[in-house]
Swiss-Prot record:
Species for this entry: Baumannia cicadellinicola subsp. Homalodisca coagulata
Protein location: Cytoplasm, Nucleoid
Main subcellular localisation: cytoplasm
Sequence similarity: Belongs to the YbaB/EbfC family.
One Pfam family hit: YbaB_DNA_bd
Keyword list, A-Z: Cytoplasm, DNA-binding
Record protein name field: Nucleoid-associated protein BCI_0116
Purpose of the protein: Binds to DNA and alters its conformation. May be involved in regulation of gene expression, nucleoid organization and DNA protection.
Length: 112
């Protein structure tokens, strides 16, 4: 099946991949991304593990209807999640190309 040197090379490659993955996950966790809605009237900042760090609401909205404000906050949060997801996908694509993974390898892993 595998020669000893082939197995050793495979294990070294797997170890290197694991180290790079852990480093990337640490970098992603430190990221902060802003999501916006209502033309910037509501802003939500989340980190790379989707924890909400900050919510900013323009004072002009405080007199408006509660339902609309809730919708804008939800939309801003979802925008931030979309942005962080794109960043993660880009980083995984970059990592996979540097590791020479097989063509078509799927990085959609639940732990990312």
């Amino acid at each position: 099946m595998f020669s000893k040197s082939g197995m050793s090379d495979l294990m070294k490659h797997a170890q290197r991949m694991q180290e790079q993955m852990q480093q990337m996950q640490g970098e992603i966790a430190k990221l902060e991304v802003n999501g916006e809605s209502g033309a910037g009237l509501v802003k939500v900042t989340i980190n790379g593990v989707y924890h909400c760090r900050r919510v900013e609401i323009d004072s002009s909205l405080l007199q408006d209807d509660k339902d609309m404000l809730e919708d804008l906050i939800t939309a801003a949060f979802n925008d931030a999640v979309r942005r962080i997801t794109e960043i993660k996908k880009d980083k995984m694509t970059s990592l996979s190309s540097s590791l020479q993974m097989p063509l078509g390898f799927n990085w959609n892993m639940p732990f990312l």
